[in-house]
Structure formats: C-alpha cells, structure tokens
Amino acid sequence: MSQTLVLKIGTSSLTNPDTGHLALATIASLVEVLSQLRQEGNQVILVSSGAVGIGCARLGLAERPKAIALKQAVAAVGQGRLMRIYDDFFTSLQQPIAQVLLTRGDLADRSRYINASNTLQELLKLGVIPIVNENDTVAVDELLRFGDNDTLSALVAGLVQADWLFILTDVDRLYSADPRIQPDAQPIVTVERMEELAALNVNAGAQGSQWGTGGMATKISAAAIATNAGVRTVITQGKTPENIPRILAGESLGTQFQPHPRPHNARKHWIAHALVPTGKLILDDGAAKAITTLGKSLLAAGITAVEGEFQSQEAVCFYDSAGVEIARGLVNYSSDELQRIQGRQSEDIPQVLGYAGAETVVHRDNLVITG
C-alpha cells in the first residue's frame, strides 16, 4: 500500500561531528533507501538540515556562527553545495528531486500555507522527492523562524497529511536520559500518549550538536506536533537509514510515537502549530471548563487578563487560573479592545466599544485545545 513518508535528517547525521565535513557514505545510503521507497510507490519528502554546517566547513569556520547575518551568508553557501550533492546522488539512481525552502511566515499565512501544500502535493504526484529546508538566508525575525528542522519536519508532515514521520538523529532511540552520559538510561520503544514521557521521568535535555540546532527536546516536541495531526512518528538512528524499510515492515527499531486517536483537522492543526501566538488571555475557571470540556466558544465575560499586543484574527494562547496553557485560537478582537471588554457580558460590548463587534471573542471553530 502506498504511503506518504516524511524523513528528517539532522546535521549530526549528515556530517562528521569533529570536522563538519559531509558523511558521504550516510548520504549515499539515505539516497538509496529513499529512491527504493519511491520506486515501491510511496510518496517521499526529505527534510534536510546541514546548510549552515556544510557552509562552515566550506568556508573553513571553526564553529557555527552566532551572528544572524553571518549565519545567513554561511547558509547560502552551504545550501547550494548540499543540493548539488543530493542531486548528484539521486540522479545516479534516476530519481528527480526538488528544492523547497520555507520560512515560518510561509506557513503562518493561510494562503501561503495552502499554496505550499498544493506545491508539495503536485511534486509528489510527479514522482519527485522534495528536499525541504528552512530558508535561513531570508528568515530574519526570530519569531518567524522554525528554529530547528525537527519542528519544520513535523509541520510538513501535517501539511501533506503524511502517514509517517521519521526523525533521524545521532542515537538509536529515545532514552530516559542521554545514554552517552548516563549508561543506565532506559530505552523507550513505544509512546502511546505524550503524557507518558513525564511519568517515565524523561530528561531530554536541550543541547544540539556543535553544528546543528536541535536536541532531543525539540524532537519530542516535533513528535507531539506530528502525532496531533495523526502522523505516526519514529525517532531513530540517522547513520543507518536502511532501518527505515525494516520499521515500515513492523520491526521494533527506534522509538515509535502512536498517532493521536482524535487528530486535529487541517485547519485546527494550522492554528495550533503553524501560527505564532502574539498574546495571552487568562481565563476564569468557568470559561476554561466551557472551552475545554463543553466545546464552547470563548466569551469576553470569562477573560480575567489580557497580555501582549495583537490585532483581530491573530493567534493567541489561553491560560487557566493556574497559569497552564489550555488552548490556542484566532481572536475576533484586538488586545486594545479586549482590555476594555474583558469580564463584560456580551450584551454590554456595543456600549463599551461604541460599535457592535463579534458575538464571541474566539469562535469554537477557530479554537484548538492544547492542554
């Protein structure tokens, strides 16, 4: 049966950890596996890191640059070399590829999000393997950066409604702690629900490699995003991409995250994960219960505080009285308007604002439970 597969490979798997030079044997193995999966009728997308790391090696830089302008320049050098190498390897197997560079802004805008989805779907129909990376050269605003390709791969998996997301990294699976530091760390084979990780006392840490940006914490976060979209997610060893067909065949390799039994629909997945929240609404207990358990829209009467500056139709986070995030949604009022009507009954709003606004602050169709 044909399936849609998204595979993310990180800088630590693509390069030598000491020199930053390309691990050509790993790339050759990866290309062979992906080409074979495509020949078997599967649709395949590769999300590849490595542009900055490869650029550093090409320019003789001893470490990853921290200054944004320099990092963007280095990424431009590395991205061209990375794609040339992929093209050489894939062409030797008669497998066409395409370069797709995305920014967070591309996915935060609804029309561009849909257009990106349409483009990827057309490439897949043509039998092409899209190679996706963040467009580091133009992603200036830190709020509009993915920050790491783990998050990007999870959003792409949701974008194309993939069946599988494989996050290839420098360990064979998720452990209760870093096995390179703590030899008694326990392997985790299957995660049915993300809440299980807290019960297992998983210490993911936050450190990426010298040449990359994503640590294990970002991979767990990416798994949460993907599984909420109904995508089965696997964290496994990047140096052995030949394990991917074995996992698809049912072997227990890596850590497998089961898809959420009630995944978000495409629009709600976009609201929950592709948008960048610009403010916070603090809710009283009645409003928190109404939206989380009763499926209600949010009314002004249930808001106790407004934080941040935002306009109508921007994304905000909702917090309960204990300070826990419980939902996200698109607001029908600006932060200035909400400061004036918070705690008010709906029938009082026209008098307070001087005009008739929306009946709800956030309609339930534009609201996603996250907590």
UniProtKB/Swiss-Prot annotation:
ATP binds at K8, T169, D170, T213, G214, G215, M216, A217, T218, K219. Pathway: Amino-acid biosynthesis; L-proline biosynthesis; L-glutamate 5-semialdehyde from L-glutamate: step 1/2. It is an enzyme of class 2 (transferase). PROSITE patterns: GLUTAMATE_5_KINASE, PUA. Substrate binds at S49, D136, N149. Its main location: cytoplasm. It catalyses: L-glutamate + ATP = L-glutamyl 5-phosphate + ADP. It holds the Pfam family PUA. InterPro entries: AceGlu_kinase-like_sf (IPR036393), Asp/Glu/Uridylate_kinase (IPR001048), G5K_ProB (IPR041739), Glu/AcGlu_kinase (IPR001057), Glu_5kinase (IPR011529), Glu_5kinase/COase_Synthase (IPR005715), Glutamate_5-kinase_CS (IPR019797), PUA (IPR002478). It is found in: Cytoplasm. One of its GO terms (cellular component) is cytosol. Residues 278-356 form the PUA domain. One of its GO terms (molecular function) is ATP binding. It comes from the Bacteria. Keywords: Amino-acid biosynthesis, ATP-binding, Cytoplasm, Kinase, Nucleotide-binding, Proline biosynthesis, Transferase. Its EC number is 2.7.2.11. GO terms for biological process: L-proline biosynthetic process. Belongs to the glutamate 5-kinase family. HAMAP family: ProB. Catalyzes the transfer of a phosphate group to glutamate to form L-glutamate 5-phosphate. This is Glutamate 5-kinase. The gene is proB.
